[in-house]
Amino acid sequence: MADKRDYYEVLGISKSASDDEIKKAYRKLAKQYHPDANPGDQTAEAKFKEASEAYAVLSDPEKKRQFDQFGHAAFEQGGGGAGGFDFNMGDMGDIFGDIFGDIFGGGRRSRASNGPMNGANLRTAIRITFEEAVFGCEKELELSLKDECETCHGSGAKPGSSAETCHKCNGKGQVTFTQQSLFGMVRNVQTCPDCRGTGKIIKEKCPDCYGSGYISRKKKIQVSVPAGIDNGQSIRIRGKGEPGTNGGERGDLLVEVNVSRHPIFQRQDYDIYSTAPMTFTQAALGGDVRISTVDGDVLYEVKPGTQTDTKVRLRGKGVPTLRNKDVRGDHYVTLVVQVPTKLNNEQKDLLKKFEESVSGKKSEDTTTEDTKEKKKKFFGK
């Protein structure tokens, strides 16, 4: 027997690969090398057979156990199929149906499509302010939604006429067809192309809805935005999506919330972050600093000698949680000392006197000595 590659190597997987990983690897190779997708390519056909043989073994728990223990020698006495053993193609029907459906455009086997089907969800977006996201709000949307046509009452047929049973699928909404493959005939089921799964054909269409059974109308919808919602989250409004078919329920409306940036506040989860200014005097002597919060301004008492970039925590001044609006996050504030940019002569003298009292030196003398020293270094004297 000619040398054969390890089955795991053929599929490009490890020995610890799960059943899903084995199936996924085979699916990829089968789609790539299937003879019908590569007509006349003998190399592709050989690789397809090799991958199919590997999958037939590794997808069967008993054969996989034998291969893991004895390798290819476990099947040398099997005779028959490619590679010295006979594998059951019936066990591979599901994956073949999936693969051939992808390659040839056929659908996967599915439940009858002419039963009740819920409508699709609709998506839209709203923009709200930072404060509206924190405390919640009410918004009104105007959307174009489909409603049952009043002329035909949703049948899609012209008044006085009725829909007929589809002859192609006999009212089932699905058609079955077979395809010849390398391994025999493969059975596929797909939605009927004539009636699109409804099982009925409308020959005389309603003049108002043109056979769809629905009319689009502008509607106003109230959106209750809960307190604590964050940017990018969505609100689900049930029953405001696309109408269902064959008695199915309407889909839902998903409203994505976009929160505008705030000039002062930033948010992380349920906590708020900001900065607040304090004067040099407040930092040195202590006192009340005014801090802006989403609830309004509050006074925070700083201790004498508070340094710039000091962080303080205002408990319960953050964002309400979605589960319980009475529970709120915190507000973290970074205190920043504001240095005055314009001083009059009197203010400058006072600061100089303060500096002298701290350093023990006259500010003018210190400046003069510094200036002299710099000049000496510059002129080399």
Curated annotation (Swiss-Prot):
CDD domains: DnaJ, DnaJ_C, DnaJ_zf
One Gene Ontology term, aspect cellular component: cytoplasm
Bias kind Basic and acidic residues: ranges: 356-373
Gene transcribed to yield this protein: dnaJ
Protein name: Chaperone protein DnaJ
Cofactor note text: Binds 2 Zn(2+) ions per monomer.
Needed co-factor(s): Zn(2+)
Segments of this protein annotated with the region Disordered: 356-381
Annotated Gene3D superfamilies: 6.20.20.10, DnaJ domain (1.10.287.110), Urease metallochaperone UreE, N-terminal domain (2.60.260.20)
Origin superkingdom: Bacteria
SMART domains to which the protein is assigned, alphabetical: DnaJ
